[in-house]
Amino acid sequence: MNSRERVIRAIEFEAPDRVPVTHSVLPAALMRYGEKLERVFRDYPSDFGTGYTYTQYEWLLSGRKRYVDEWGCVWFKEQKGLMGQVKGHPIADWKAFETYRFPTLPDKRLGYVTGSGGSLFERMQWLRGFKNLLKDLMTGRREVILLRDKVVDYNLQVIRRSLESKVDGIGFSDDWGTQDRLMIKPSLWREFYKPAYKRMFDEVHKGGAHVHFHSDGYIMDIIPDLVEIGVDALNPQFSCMNLEALGKVCAGKVCVVSDIDRQRILPFGSVEEVRESVKRVISIFGSYNRGLIGRGEIGPDVPLKNVKAMFQAFKEYGKYPLTP
Protein backbone atom coordinates (compact mmCIF):
# COMPACT_ATOMS: atom_id res chain seq x y z
CA MET A 1 0.00 0.00 0.00
CA ASN A 2 1.50 3.35 -1.00
CA SER A 3 1.08 6.63 0.88
CA ARG A 4 -1.65 8.01 -1.38
CA GLU A 5 -3.72 4.84 -1.04
CA ARG A 6 -3.19 4.87 2.73
CA VAL A 7 -4.52 8.43 3.14
CA ILE A 8 -7.50 7.84 0.85
CA ARG A 9 -8.42 4.68 2.76
CA ALA A 10 -8.25 6.52 6.08
CA ILE A 11 -10.49 9.33 4.82
CA GLU A 12 -12.98 6.89 3.29
CA PHE A 13 -12.93 4.40 6.23
CA GLU A 14 -11.56 1.60 4.07
CA ALA A 15 -8.97 0.09 6.43
CA PRO A 16 -5.45 1.35 5.71
CA ASP A 17 -2.53 -0.75 6.96
CA ARG A 18 -1.51 1.90 9.50
CA VAL A 19 -2.30 5.44 10.61
CA PRO A 20 -1.04 7.79 7.87
CA VAL A 21 0.93 10.80 9.12
CA THR A 22 1.55 14.33 7.91
CA HIS A 23 4.14 16.97 8.82
CA SER A 24 2.83 20.26 10.18
CA VAL A 25 5.59 22.71 11.07
CA LEU A 26 5.82 26.45 11.63
CA PRO A 27 8.65 28.28 9.82
CA ALA A 28 9.96 29.40 13.23
CA ALA A 29 10.61 25.75 14.14
CA LEU A 30 12.53 25.20 10.90
CA MET A 31 14.55 28.32 11.69
CA ARG A 32 15.39 27.01 15.15
CA TYR A 33 16.23 23.40 14.32
CA GLY A 34 17.14 23.44 10.62
CA GLU A 35 18.76 20.23 9.42
CA LYS A 36 18.05 18.42 12.71
CA LEU A 37 14.31 18.75 12.14
CA GLU A 38 14.64 17.88 8.45
CA ARG A 39 16.41 14.69 9.54
CA VAL A 40 13.46 13.75 11.76
CA PHE A 41 11.12 14.29 8.80
CA ARG A 42 13.30 12.02 6.66
CA ASP A 43 13.22 9.34 9.36
CA TYR A 44 9.41 9.59 9.58
CA PRO A 45 8.19 10.48 6.06
CA SER A 46 4.84 12.18 5.50
CA ASP A 47 2.16 10.29 3.62
CA PHE A 48 1.12 13.60 2.08
CA GLY A 49 4.37 14.35 0.25
CA THR A 50 4.94 18.10 0.05
CA GLY A 51 4.11 19.87 3.30
CA TYR A 52 2.38 23.15 4.01
CA THR A 53 3.43 26.29 2.15
CA TYR A 54 3.04 29.93 3.14
CA THR A 55 2.40 32.76 0.68
CA GLN A 56 4.28 35.12 3.02
CA TYR A 57 7.15 32.67 3.56
CA GLU A 58 9.95 35.10 2.64
CA TRP A 59 8.46 37.75 4.92
CA LEU A 60 8.01 35.28 7.77
CA LEU A 61 11.72 34.49 7.72
CA SER A 62 12.85 38.09 7.20
CA GLY A 63 13.49 40.76 9.80
CA ARG A 64 10.72 43.00 8.43
CA LYS A 65 7.79 43.41 10.81
CA ARG A 66 5.26 44.71 8.26
CA TYR A 67 3.81 42.97 5.21
CA VAL A 68 0.97 43.84 2.83
CA ASP A 69 -0.57 40.76 1.21
CA GLU A 70 -2.28 40.47 -2.17
CA TRP A 71 -5.63 41.30 -0.55
CA GLY A 72 -4.34 44.62 0.79
CA CYS A 73 -4.35 43.38 4.40
CA VAL A 74 -1.47 44.74 6.48
CA TRP A 75 0.25 42.10 8.64
CA PHE A 76 2.57 42.73 11.59
CA LYS A 77 4.69 40.11 13.33
CA GLU A 78 6.55 40.24 16.63
CA GLN A 79 8.80 37.23 16.00
CA LYS A 80 10.47 35.85 12.90
CA GLY A 81 8.84 32.66 11.66
CA LEU A 82 5.40 33.24 13.20
CA MET A 83 2.35 34.37 11.25
CA GLY A 84 1.61 37.58 13.14
CA GLN A 85 -1.71 39.42 12.97
CA VAL A 86 -3.61 41.64 10.57
CA LYS A 87 -3.66 45.22 11.87
CA GLY A 88 -4.66 47.04 8.69
CA HIS A 89 -8.04 46.17 7.13
CA PRO A 90 -8.73 47.40 3.57
CA ILE A 91 -12.52 47.40 4.03
CA ALA A 92 -12.61 48.70 7.61
CA ASP A 93 -14.89 51.40 6.20
CA TRP A 94 -17.73 50.06 4.05
CA LYS A 95 -17.25 53.01 1.69
CA ALA A 96 -14.06 51.32 0.49
CA PHE A 97 -16.03 48.21 -0.53
CA GLU A 98 -17.44 49.96 -3.60
CA THR A 99 -13.98 50.41 -5.12
CA TYR A 100 -12.22 47.38 -3.62
CA ARG A 101 -10.62 45.03 -6.14
CA PHE A 102 -10.16 41.36 -5.34
CA PRO A 103 -6.68 39.97 -6.14
CA THR A 104 -5.94 38.23 -9.41
CA LEU A 105 -5.74 34.45 -9.31
CA PRO A 106 -2.29 32.83 -9.13
CA ASP A 107 -0.75 32.15 -12.54
CA LYS A 108 -1.33 28.45 -13.16
CA ARG A 109 1.80 28.42 -15.33
CA LEU A 110 3.81 28.49 -12.11
CA GLY A 111 3.05 24.79 -11.99
CA TYR A 112 2.66 24.42 -8.21
CA VAL A 113 -0.85 24.07 -6.83
CA THR A 114 -1.31 23.71 -3.07
CA GLY A 115 -4.87 22.38 -3.17
CA SER A 116 -6.08 25.23 -0.97
CA GLY A 117 -9.70 26.30 -0.80
CA GLY A 118 -8.85 29.37 1.24
CA SER A 119 -10.67 30.76 4.24
CA LEU A 120 -13.97 32.57 4.65
CA PHE A 121 -14.51 33.81 8.21
CA GLU A 122 -10.85 34.76 8.63
CA ARG A 123 -10.67 36.46 5.24
CA MET A 124 -13.70 38.56 6.13
CA GLN A 125 -12.08 39.43 9.49
CA TRP A 126 -8.88 40.53 7.80
CA LEU A 127 -10.72 42.67 5.29
CA ARG A 128 -13.14 44.30 7.73
CA GLY A 129 -11.54 43.88 11.16
CA PHE A 130 -12.78 41.44 13.81
CA LYS A 131 -14.99 43.83 15.79
CA ASN A 132 -16.45 45.40 12.66
CA LEU A 133 -17.34 41.97 11.27
CA LEU A 134 -19.07 40.83 14.45
CA LYS A 135 -21.15 44.01 14.46
CA ASP A 136 -22.02 43.43 10.79
CA LEU A 137 -23.17 39.89 11.52
CA MET A 138 -25.32 40.98 14.44
CA THR A 139 -26.97 43.82 12.52
CA GLY A 140 -27.34 41.86 9.26
CA ARG A 141 -25.90 44.57 7.03
CA ARG A 142 -26.49 44.04 3.33
CA GLU A 143 -22.82 44.68 2.59
CA VAL A 144 -21.61 41.80 4.77
CA ILE A 145 -23.71 39.37 2.74
CA LEU A 146 -22.23 40.77 -0.47
CA LEU A 147 -18.71 40.49 0.96
CA ARG A 148 -19.28 36.88 2.02
CA ASP A 149 -20.54 35.96 -1.44
CA LYS A 150 -17.65 37.71 -3.19
CA VAL A 151 -15.10 35.89 -1.02
CA VAL A 152 -16.85 32.59 -1.77
CA ASP A 153 -16.87 33.38 -5.50
CA TYR A 154 -13.14 34.07 -5.36
CA ASN A 155 -12.47 30.86 -3.42
CA LEU A 156 -14.48 28.89 -5.97
CA GLN A 157 -12.12 30.10 -8.68
CA VAL A 158 -9.14 29.00 -6.59
CA ILE A 159 -10.78 25.62 -5.99
CA ARG A 160 -11.41 25.09 -9.71
CA ARG A 161 -7.84 26.05 -10.51
CA SER A 162 -6.58 23.50 -7.97
CA LEU A 163 -8.91 20.80 -9.28
CA GLU A 164 -7.45 21.28 -12.76
CA SER A 165 -4.20 19.91 -11.30
CA LYS A 166 -5.96 16.70 -10.21
CA VAL A 167 -5.30 17.16 -6.50
CA ASP A 168 -6.70 14.56 -4.14
CA GLY A 169 -8.01 17.03 -1.56
CA ILE A 170 -8.72 20.71 -1.01
CA GLY A 171 -7.94 22.27 2.36
CA PHE A 172 -9.96 24.98 4.11
CA SER A 173 -8.93 26.79 7.28
CA ASP A 174 -11.01 29.02 9.56
CA ASP A 175 -10.49 29.34 13.31
CA TRP A 176 -14.02 29.33 14.71
CA GLY A 177 -13.58 28.69 18.40
CA THR A 178 -12.30 30.24 21.58
CA GLN A 179 -11.02 27.92 24.31
CA ASP A 180 -14.54 26.92 25.38
CA ARG A 181 -17.12 28.13 22.84
CA LEU A 182 -17.83 29.23 19.30
CA MET A 183 -17.05 32.86 18.46
CA ILE A 184 -20.62 33.43 17.30
CA LYS A 185 -23.88 31.70 18.17
CA PRO A 186 -24.24 28.32 16.44
CA SER A 187 -27.61 29.45 15.06
CA LEU A 188 -25.98 32.47 13.39
CA TRP A 189 -23.21 30.28 12.00
CA ARG A 190 -25.80 27.93 10.49
CA GLU A 191 -27.78 30.78 8.98
CA PHE A 192 -24.91 32.83 7.57
CA TYR A 193 -21.87 30.61 7.01
CA LYS A 194 -23.11 27.05 6.60
CA PRO A 195 -24.68 27.61 3.14
CA ALA A 196 -21.53 29.42 1.98
CA TYR A 197 -19.28 26.54 3.01
CA LYS A 198 -21.62 24.09 1.32
CA ARG A 199 -21.22 25.94 -1.99
CA MET A 200 -17.46 25.50 -1.78
CA PHE A 201 -17.50 21.92 -0.51
CA ASP A 202 -19.95 20.87 -3.24
CA GLU A 203 -17.54 22.24 -5.85
CA VAL A 204 -14.70 20.16 -4.39
CA HIS A 205 -16.77 16.98 -4.43
CA LYS A 206 -17.96 17.72 -7.95
CA GLY A 207 -14.30 17.71 -8.94
CA GLY A 208 -13.74 14.33 -7.29
CA ALA A 209 -11.62 15.54 -4.35
CA HIS A 210 -11.91 15.33 -0.57
CA VAL A 211 -12.72 18.31 1.66
CA HIS A 212 -10.22 18.95 4.47
CA PHE A 213 -11.21 21.47 7.15
CA HIS A 214 -9.13 22.95 9.98
CA SER A 215 -10.36 25.02 12.88
CA ASP A 216 -8.73 26.02 16.14
CA GLY A 217 -10.80 26.38 19.29
CA TYR A 218 -13.97 24.74 20.59
CA ILE A 219 -16.19 23.77 17.64
CA MET A 220 -18.16 20.81 19.02
CA ASP A 221 -21.48 22.57 18.32
CA ILE A 222 -20.94 22.73 14.55
CA ILE A 223 -19.09 19.48 13.84
CA PRO A 224 -22.32 17.64 12.88
CA ASP A 225 -23.09 20.53 10.50
CA LEU A 226 -19.62 20.36 8.93
CA VAL A 227 -20.04 16.63 8.40
CA GLU A 228 -23.51 17.17 6.95
CA ILE A 229 -22.28 19.63 4.31
CA GLY A 230 -19.38 17.47 3.22
CA VAL A 231 -16.21 17.71 5.32
CA ASP A 232 -14.28 14.47 4.76
CA ALA A 233 -11.24 15.11 6.98
CA LEU A 234 -11.52 17.35 10.05
CA ASN A 235 -8.57 18.85 11.94
CA PRO A 236 -9.92 20.26 15.24
CA GLN A 237 -7.89 21.58 18.18
CA PHE A 238 -7.87 18.68 20.64
CA SER A 239 -6.85 20.72 23.69
CA CYS A 240 -10.12 22.70 23.56
CA MET A 241 -12.46 19.70 23.63
CA ASN A 242 -13.02 16.45 25.48
CA LEU A 243 -11.49 13.75 23.29
CA GLU A 244 -13.93 11.01 24.25
CA ALA A 245 -16.89 13.28 23.45
CA LEU A 246 -15.21 14.35 20.22
CA GLY A 247 -14.70 10.71 19.31
CA LYS A 248 -18.40 9.98 19.73
CA VAL A 249 -19.34 12.90 17.47
CA CYS A 250 -16.81 12.00 14.76
CA ALA A 251 -16.58 8.19 14.86
CA GLY A 252 -17.48 6.71 11.52
CA LYS A 253 -18.72 10.04 10.19
CA VAL A 254 -15.57 12.02 9.41
CA CYS A 255 -11.87 11.20 9.30
CA VAL A 256 -10.04 13.03 12.09
CA VAL A 257 -6.66 14.67 11.48
CA SER A 258 -5.15 14.68 14.96
CA ASP A 259 -3.85 17.70 16.85
CA ILE A 260 -1.58 16.38 19.59
CA ASP A 261 -1.91 18.95 22.38
CA ARG A 262 0.28 21.89 21.27
CA GLN A 263 -0.65 24.06 24.24
CA ARG A 264 0.86 21.78 26.90
CA ILE A 265 1.96 18.25 25.98
CA LEU A 266 4.05 18.81 22.84
CA PRO A 267 5.95 21.88 24.07
CA PHE A 268 6.17 21.12 27.79
CA GLY A 269 5.35 17.45 28.34
CA SER A 270 7.77 14.58 28.79
CA VAL A 271 8.55 12.06 26.06
CA GLU A 272 6.35 9.53 27.86
CA GLU A 273 3.45 12.01 28.03
CA VAL A 274 3.74 12.57 24.28
CA ARG A 275 3.73 8.83 23.62
CA GLU A 276 0.74 8.26 25.89
CA SER A 277 -1.14 11.13 24.22
CA VAL A 278 -0.59 9.60 20.78
CA LYS A 279 -1.63 6.18 22.05
CA ARG A 280 -4.83 7.63 23.50
CA VAL A 281 -5.65 9.47 20.26
CA ILE A 282 -5.16 6.29 18.22
CA SER A 283 -7.37 4.27 20.56
CA ILE A 284 -10.19 6.84 20.35
CA PHE A 285 -10.13 7.84 16.68
CA GLY A 286 -8.38 4.93 14.98
CA SER A 287 -10.52 2.17 16.40
CA TYR A 288 -13.58 2.85 14.22
CA ASN A 289 -12.75 1.74 10.65
CA ARG A 290 -9.37 3.43 10.97
CA GLY A 291 -10.53 6.97 10.14
CA LEU A 292 -7.50 8.78 11.57
CA ILE A 293 -4.57 10.77 10.18
CA GLY A 294 -1.67 11.45 12.55
CA ARG A 295 -0.55 15.04 12.99
CA GLY A 296 0.82 17.43 15.59
CA GLU A 297 1.82 21.03 14.94
CA ILE A 298 5.52 21.63 15.52
CA GLY A 299 6.24 25.12 16.79
CA PRO A 300 9.56 26.63 17.90
CA ASP A 301 8.79 25.75 21.53
CA VAL A 302 8.48 22.00 20.86
CA PRO A 303 11.64 20.05 21.84
CA LEU A 304 13.06 17.82 19.12
CA LYS A 305 12.84 14.82 21.45
CA ASN A 306 9.06 15.31 21.61
CA VAL A 307 8.82 15.59 17.82
CA LYS A 308 10.62 12.26 17.50
CA ALA A 309 8.50 10.72 20.25
CA MET A 310 5.28 11.76 18.50
CA PHE A 311 6.19 10.25 15.12
CA GLN A 312 7.70 7.13 16.70
CA ALA A 313 4.50 6.59 18.71
CA PHE A 314 2.32 6.91 15.60
CA LYS A 315 4.58 4.36 13.89
CA GLU A 316 4.63 2.01 16.87
CA TYR A 317 1.01 2.15 18.01
CA GLY A 318 -0.64 2.98 14.68
CA LYS A 319 -0.34 -0.40 12.97
CA TYR A 320 -3.68 -2.03 12.17
CA PRO A 321 -5.32 -4.02 13.56
CA LEU A 322 -4.77 -2.10 16.78
CA THR A 323 -3.37 -3.91 19.81
CA PRO A 324 -5.76 -3.56 22.79
Task: Annotate each predicted stretch with a short phrase.
Residues 30, 78-100:
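Short, surface-exposed, low-complexity cationic segments
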Residues 1-31, 68, 77, 99-324:
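Active-site loop segments of alpha/beta catalytic cores
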Residues 32-41, 64-68:
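Glycine-rich loop at the start of a catalytic domain that most often binds anionic cofactors/ligands
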